[in-house]
C-alpha cells in the first residue's frame, strides 16, 4: 500500500502532466485557424446540418473566412473554402498537403491499403505505378477509346430494345461505365445480365448508399465507438468482406494463368511487380493489390455514371441546349461513323455542356480529404502534422467571380464571345495538386464518347411536363444525389 506522501506525489504529478497537455493543446488551438467552439467528444455536431453539410460549411466560411477549423466528433478538420485558399494549399504548398485524409466509411473496406495507405512514400509509389499501368493499357489513348465505344455499342442496343418506353437509365449507365474499368482491371467485360456482375454493382451501391446515409455520417465522426456497436455499419462490414473475397478470387484466377512477359490487365501488372519486389517492406503485396483494384472499381463506376445521369435530366430540362448538341454532332460527326475523342476539339459547345453538367452537379462538394505530412504554416496559421484538411472543391464551382449566376445551368460559363471553349481556372472537378483524381483522363473520354454516342442515336423525352423536372441535386450529408426519374430514349 502506498503511503500518503507518495500517493500525493503521484496525484500531483498526474495533475501536472494533465495541465501541461491541456496547456499545449490550448496553444495549438490558439495558432490553428478560427472556428466554432467544439464540445467534448461530439465536436461541432450540433452546429452542422447533417442533412446538408456543404451548406453548413458555406455558412461557416462566411463567418470565419476561407480557412477555418471544425471538429467532426473528436476529429479536427481544417477547411479550405474558395479558389484562392484551395490553390494556395494544393498547388503552392502541394508537398505539405500531399497526405491522404481519413475516410472512415471507406476504411471499413480498404483498411488503410491501396490508395488509402497512410505511409506517404509507399502511397506515392502505388499511385505512380497505377497511373503508369493505366497508361500502358491505353487510358487517354485509342486503345481505351475502342473499349469505351464497344461498351457504348452495347448500351445503344440495350436502349433501342426499350422501344421508347420510359425507363430509369441509372442501372444501364452503371453497367456501361463499370465495364470500361473492368476491362482494364480484369482484362474483360461482363455481360449486362451476368449474376456476378450484378452482385458486384449491388455491393458497390450498398457501400455508396451507406457512406451518404445518416449512419454513415455518424460513423465518419464516431467510428472509434460505432465499429463496436450494433447497427447498419455491421451489415456493411459483411458487404466489404464479400467485396474483398470477390477480388481475392479474381487475383487467384489471374495468378494461375499469369505470363510475366505478357500482362493482360492491371492485376497481372501488379502481380508481376510483386514478383520483382520480394523484399520485406515492399508496398507491392497482396493486400495492396486487392484494395488498389477495388479502389479502381469504385472510382471508375460511380462518378461518370452519376454525372451522365444528371446530364440527361438537365438536357431534358433545357431542350434548347440538347438541340444545339444534336446540331453540333450532326455537323461534325454525322451519322455514318462513331464519335472519336479527337472530335471534342471541334465541338466546343458539346464540351462546354459536359463541363457545365459537372460544375452544376457538384456531386462531391467536400472533395477528398488531405492530410498534413509535416508541421506547416499556412496563411499565418499553424497546422500540425497529421491534421486532416477538407479542400472544398465544390466552393470553386459556385464562386461568383468565376461563374456569374452560378445557380443557373448555363454552358456559356465555358464559352467565349466567339463560341469557342475557354478555360476556367476554378473548374477543377478532379481536384488539383499531388492527389488529383488519377482517372481524370479516362473520365473525360468516357463523358464525351458516351454522351455523343447516345445523342447521335436518340432524342430525350421526359414523360411529364418539363416544369416538373427538379434539376437540382438533393443534399445528403457530405454529398449530393440526383433525384430518381424516368425518361424515354426516342430513336433518331
Curated annotation (Swiss-Prot):
Top-tier EC class: oxidoreductase
Reaction catalysed by this enzyme: an organic molecule + reduced [NADPH--hemoprotein reductase] + O2 = an alcohol + oxidized [NADPH--hemoprotein reductase] + H2O + H(+)
GO biological process terms held by the UniProt record: coumarin metabolic process; epoxygenase P450 pathway; xenobiotic metabolic process
Tissue expression: Liver specific.
Cofactor: heme
Keyword list, A-Z: Endoplasmic reticulum, Heme, Iron, Membrane, Metal-binding, Microsome, Monooxygenase, Oxidoreductase
One MF term in the entry's GO annotations: steroid hydroxylase activity
Compartments in which it is found: Endoplasmic reticulum membrane; Microsome membrane
Highest taxon of source: Eukaryota
Residues reported in the UniProt entry to bind heme: 437
Tagged with keyword tRNA processing: no
Main location: endoplasmic reticulum
Disulfide bonds: none
GO cellular component: cytoplasm; endoplasmic reticulum membrane; intracellular membrane-bounded organelle
Keyword Coiled coil: no
InterPro entries: Cyt_P450, Cyt_P450_CS, Cyt_P450_E_grp-I, Cyt_P450_E_grp-I_CYP2A-like, Cyt_P450_sf, Cytochrome_P450_fam2
PANTHER family, per the entry: CYTOCHROME P450 508A4-RELATED, CYTOCHROME P450-RELATED
Sequence similarity: Belongs to the cytochrome P450 family.
The protein's name: Cytochrome P450 2A2
Gene label: Cyp2a2
Amino acid at each position: 500500500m502506498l503511503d500518503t506522501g507518495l500517493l500525493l506525489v503521484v496525484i500531483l504529478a498526474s495533475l501536472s502532466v494533465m495541465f501541461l497537455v491541456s496547456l499545449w493543446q490550448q496553444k495549438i488551438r490558439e495558432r490553428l485557424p478560427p472556428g466554432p467552439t467544439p464540445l467534448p467528444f461530439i465536436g461541432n455536431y450540433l452546429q452542422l446540418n447533417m442533412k446538408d453539410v456543404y451548406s453548413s460549411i458555406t455558412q461557416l466560411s462566411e463567418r470565419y473566412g476561407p480557412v477555418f477549423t471544425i471538429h467532426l466528433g473528436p476529429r479536427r478538420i481544417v477547411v479550405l473554402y474558395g479558389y484562392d485558399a484551395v490553390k494556395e494549399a494544393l498547388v503552392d504548398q502541394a508537398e505539405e498537403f500531399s497526405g491522404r485524409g481519413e475516410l472512415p466509411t471507406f476504411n471499413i473496406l480498404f483498411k488503410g491499403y491501396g490508395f488509402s495507405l497512410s505511409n506517404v512514400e509507399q502511397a506515392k509509389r502505388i499511385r505512380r505505378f497505377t497511373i503508369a499501368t493505366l497508361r500502358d493499357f491505353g487510358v487517354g489513348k485509342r486503345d481505351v477509346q475502342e473499349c469505351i465505344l464497344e461498351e457504348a455499342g452495347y448500351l445503344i442496343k440495350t436502349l433501342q430494345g426499350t422501344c421508347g418506353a420510359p425507363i430509369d437509365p441509372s442501372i444501364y449507365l452503371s453497367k456501361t461505365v463499370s465495364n470500361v474499368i473492368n476491362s482494364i482491371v480484369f482484362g474483360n467485360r461482363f455481360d449486362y445480365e451476368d449474376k456476378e456482375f450484378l452482385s458486384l454493382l449491388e455491393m458497390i451501391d450498398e457501400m455508396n448508399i451507406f457512406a451518404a446515409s445518416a449512419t454513415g455520417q455518424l460513423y465518419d465522426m464516431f467510428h472509434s465507438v460505432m465499429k463496436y456497436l450494433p447497427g447498419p455499419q455491421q451489415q456493411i462490414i459483411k458487404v466489404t468482406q464479400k467485396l474483398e473475397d470477390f477480388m481475392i478470387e479474381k487475383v487467384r484466377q489471374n495468378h494461375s494463368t499469369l505470363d510475366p512477359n505478357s500482362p493482360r490487365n492491371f492485376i497481372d501488372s501488379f502481380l508481376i511487380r510483386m514478383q520483382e519486389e520480394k523484399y520485406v517492406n515492399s508496398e507491392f503485396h497482396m493486400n495492396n493489390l486487392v484494395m488498389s483494384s477495388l479502389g479502381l472499381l469504385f472510382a471508375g463506376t460511380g462518378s461518370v455514371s452519376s454525372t451522365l445521369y444528371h446530364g440527361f435530366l438537365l438536357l431534358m430540362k433545357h431542350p434548347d441546349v440538347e438541340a444545339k448538341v444534336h446540331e453540333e454532332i450532326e455537323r461534325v460527326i454525322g451519322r455514318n461513323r462513331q464519335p472519336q475523342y479527337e472530335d471534342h476539339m471541334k465541338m466546343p459547345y458539346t464540351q462546354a455542356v459536359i463541363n457545365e453538367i459537372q460544375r452544376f452537379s457538384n456531386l462531391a462538394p467536400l472533395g477528398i480529404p488531405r492530410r498534413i505530412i509535416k508541421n506547416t504554416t499556412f496563411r499565418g496559421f499553424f497546422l500540425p502534422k497529421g491534421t486532416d484538411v477538407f479542400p472544398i472543391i465544390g466552393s470553386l464551382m459556385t464562386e461568383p467571380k468565376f461563374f456569374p449566376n452560378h445557380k443557373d445551368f448555363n454552358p456559356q460559363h465555358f464559352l467565349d464571345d466567339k463560341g469557342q471553349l475557354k478555360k476556367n481556372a476554378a473548374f477543377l472537378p478532379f481536384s488539383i495538386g499531388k492527389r488529383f483524381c488519377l482517372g481524370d483522363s479516362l473520365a473525360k473520354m468516357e463523358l464525351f464518347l458516351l454522351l455523343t454516342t447516345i445523342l447521335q442515336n436518340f432524342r430525350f423525352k421526359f414523360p411529364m411536363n418539363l416544369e416538373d423536372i427538379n434539376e437540382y441535386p438533393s443534399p445528403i450529408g457530405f454529398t449530393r444525389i440526383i433525384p430518381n426519374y424516368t425518361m424515354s430514349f426516342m430513336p433518331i
